[in-house]
Amino acid sequence: DMKYVTEEFYIPEAQIPRWEYFKGSKREKRVRADGFEYFYTEGGMAFPDSLDSPSRTIITSEGGKSPDRCRHVIQDQTGRLRRLIPLELERLNMFPDNHTYHPEVSDGRRAFLMGNALVCGLVTRVGNELRARLRKREVDSTNLV
């Protein structure tokens, strides 16, 4: 819901190259303090994140404004790039809207909490399946005689 998106979530044009660097593939020669040389490599990621594909996992570093490889960035209906707001993170994890809201809790902390969460709907489905199997097991065990 765009009415909850404030300017602070939009990525300034000047920062976009830095975001592209963090999200891009790398093969960089590095040198440890002891002089050992090695190559740091990592594959590229989508930038911005696709709105038509399943989301990547939300991790605890999701909050914050600085460019980061793991933070989700989308191009919204305004055409601008932005980070996800806490409400969107809650929805991705299938929590009720504003589940993490409290006047004394920052947006960064709310994002951290969602990064530490499990997707509620999946946990519910697994729990329901376990319950059904345990009940079936109880019924089957009473028919042994």
Region locations from a protein language model:
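C-terminal target-recognition/interaction regions appended to catalytic cores
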Residues: 1-145
